Regions:
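Short glycine-cluster motifs
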Residues: 1-61
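Peripheral docking tails and interdomain loops at the edges
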Residues: 61-138
């Protein structure tokens, strides 16, 4: 529905699960898609920001893009009700590394769980869901 219409159909994009927003958001942010996902049939949202892997136009810095994305994630977390986790894959570039640490602190201060890898986030989400399922059975 509405979520699928937002995403283009470029070759290589995964349009089911997970949703690939890699060709958007670097200057405009990702608030719009996050807001749509809050209404869609999505149970849990993991936002992955792969530092050092962005294919950005030359005029856009990776640090600027990171700030825009984190701002939108924090805004959606405050306004929405869906459980969210954020993964910021690390980079070895000194300037970017400092920005990553600062944004991780911003996300944690907003109450969002922050992970360094998708696998670490997936394990934590799995445990979170199993814990809640166990509580529901009691």
């Amino acid at each position: 529905g509405e979520l699928r219409r937002h995403f283009n159909n470029d070759p290589g994009l995964i349009l089911h699960n997970p949703i690939d927003e890699s060709t958007h958001g670097f200057t405009d942010g990702i608030y719009g898609p996050l807001k749509i996902m809050q209404k869609a049939e999505v149970d849990f949202l993991m936002v992955h920001i792969p530092m050092g892997m962005f294919l950005l136009p030359q005029a856009i810095s990776e640090v600027t893009s990171l700030k825009v994305l984190v701002k939108d994630v924090v805004r959606m977390h405050r306004e929405g009700s869906m459980p969210m986790a954020v993964v910021i894959s690390h980079t070895i570039l000194p300037d970017t590394r400092v920005a990553v640490i600062e944004r991780q602190e911003t996300l944690a201060a907003a109450g969002l769980p922050v992970f360094n890898s998708v696998s670490g986030a997936a394990r934590a989400i799995d445990r979170f869901i199993k814990w809640h399922e166990g509580r529901a059975e009691v």
